[in-house]
A protein has these predicted regions:
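Fe(II)/2-oxoglutarate oxygenase catalytic core
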Residues: 1-176, 180-226
């Protein structure tokens, strides 16, 4: 484990999270499904990023199902569908694995991973469309667990400009950080982006950890700025 930035804006790297073969299998599973990155539930091509991506459900790939317990153990959070006594998962409590590919020139402008600007008892404000919508049953993106599925010859670092941190992709490693404060508000210091790929191809897998499935793993703070 490597600490890139200390608390309260903790950024960690875990090395050898995936073997080279496991990373290659995720890339192979994703390649036939890849589409141009978009926003707004796939209805609008994103101008913030130049990449392709896809979503893989746990039960669609035995490979992902086998990896999920490992992700849970590393992050200490529920990252995949929690199973009930009948062996069935509550899909509304988690977010599927996203695989993304950035070719030469591919990048992702600085952004925040939380989906909501702020929350009220009866509605939330969605950060992209600035519209009031009912609360998501999954809750917001509490934390991010991003795995590098390839090395990159040049460029492609993950940068946190407000913290002065830049992490070079290393195949099989993963980066972990919290997006929300204990109060549930977005941590604006966690602004980050994917630097342009200068040479090579960058593959990553993102597992966004949601609030609802982890409400007992991440106690709330008693102050709005916590």
């Amino acid at each position: 484990m490597e600490v890139h930035h200390p608390e309260p804006h903790l950024i960690l790297s875990y090395h050898n999270v995936l073997s080279s073969n496991e990373a290659d299998k995720l890339v192979a599973a994703a390649q036939p499904r890849m589409v141009q990155a978009s926003i707004g539930h796939g209805k609008e091509v994103s101008e913030m990023r130049v990449s392709r991506n896809c979503w893989i459900k746990d039960f669609e790939s035995g490979h992902v199902d086998k990896l999920s317990p490992r992700f849970n153990w590393i992050t200490k959070y529920q990252t995949s569908r929690p199973l009930d006594i009948h062996g069935e998962g509550k899909e509304e409590e988690y977010e599927h694995l996203q695989v993304a590919n950035y070719g030469i020139g591919g990048h992702y402008q600085s952004h925040q991973d939380p989906m909501f600007v702020y929350k009220e008892p009866d509605f939330i404000v969605y950060s992209v469309q600035e519209k009031k919508i009912p609360p998501y049953p999954t809750g917001d993106r509490l934390a991010t667990f991003m795995m590098y599925l390839s090395d990159v010859a040049k460029g492609g670092s993950t940068a946190f400009p407000r913290l002065g941190v830049a992490i070079k992709p290393q195949k099989g490693s993963a980066v972990f950080w919290h997006n929300l404060k204990r109060s549930g508000r977005s941590d604006m210091f966690m602004l980050h982006g994917g630097c342009p790929v200068v040479l090579g191809s960058k593959w990553v897998a993102n597992k966004w950890i949601r609030e609802t499935a982890n409400m007992f793993h991440s106690p709330c703070g008693d102050h709005i700025d916590v």
